[in-house]
Regions:
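Short, conserved DNA-binding cores of transcription-related domains
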Residues: 1-83, 89
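Short, positively charged, Gly/Tyr-enriched micro-motifs
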Residues: 43, 58-152
């Protein structure tokens, strides 16, 4: 697509291939720049793509419009250990459907106001907002403990 969209999106390791608007929502089709991964199981590199299924991930809004990223979820075959590791994406936590920066934004906004207001603003249900808030809070506590241990 355009260097400008890649620059504005500012997510590592991806390129914007398509940009479409449906009603009030913006959809960005992304491609991943890396050709392979390091297997999570045996730590050997592999570039043998087994399958790629797209997932839809919510990102920060732009100009008051919600943004969704269509990301290929790639699974590779590792000939060394004969397993099928799924590629990890830097800006997306495992089994999450929102970018880390979107979840961080929700967390900060809930701290400043309340969940009901964020539910109205984002168009998500209460349980989803609460789940995002609790997940970010849990990650922060875990990171805080790790920092504390490393200081000792």
């Amino acid at each position: 697509m355009s260097f400008h969209l890649d620059y504005l999106l500012a997510l590592p390791g991806v390129r914007v291939e398509t940009c479409t608007q449906v009603e009030e929502k913006i959809f960005l089709g992304l491609s991943i720049l890396s050709k392979g991964i390091v297997c999570h199981h045996c730590k050997n590199p592999t570039g043998k793509l087994h399958q790629a299924r797209p997932i839809l991930v919510r990102d920060l809004s732009v100009f008051g419009r919600p943004v969704y990223l269509k990301i290929p979820r790639r699974q590779f075959y590792c000939p060394t250990c004969q397993r099928y590791p799924t590629e990890r994406i830097d800006f997306l936590d495992v089994k999450r459907r929102h970018t880390q920066r979107y979840e961080q934004n929700i967390y900060e906004r809930v701290k400043q106001s309340n969940m009901e207001q964020i539910v109205r603003e984002e168009g998500l249900n209460y349980d989803k907002i609460k789940g995002i808030f609790e997940q970010v809070k849990k990650n922060r506590i875990g990171n805080g403990l790790n920092e504390f241990v490393s200081m000792r």
